[in-house]
Amino acid sequence: MMVKAGCGTDAVIKEITPLLQPGDVLVDGGNAYFGDTRRREEEIRPTGIHYVGTGISGGEVGALEGPSIMPGGSKESYEIIGPVLEKISAHVDGEPCCAWMGTDGAGHFVKMVHNGIEYADMQFIGEAPSLLLAAGFNKAEEP
């Protein structure tokens, strides 16, 4: 399931869980807040359905060539879906860019940390020229 984070995710879950059976796995690949993922895991657990909050990263290239996949959920759920996720993920040196992150919203937590680092890097890159000019460096000068 790839749904915009928030109430839309809850609405889709409410709509599709009656169609699922105990032992089925529901993968949430949206950018959900990990606290919401924890709540959803707790709410769905009594049904016997495995809810897996999963961070997915890679943008357009990832969509075409395979993303980095960060699934959370129970270890049992990863044993069920891990082989499929590993096959569709990106690979580096023959190894899948996919690993179980842990329980309790861990997949979405790791994705949140990833996004924080990525956005900080982009902010730094965007501000670096201004900072260098303010420090007296001239882009026309040779190093």
Regions found by a protein language model. Name each.
Residues 142-143:
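Small-residue-rich helix-loop
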Residues 3:
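Conserved NAD(P)H cofactor-binding loop of Rossmann-fold oxidoreductase domains
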Residues 8-14, 27, 33-138:
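Rossmann-fold dinucleotide-binding core
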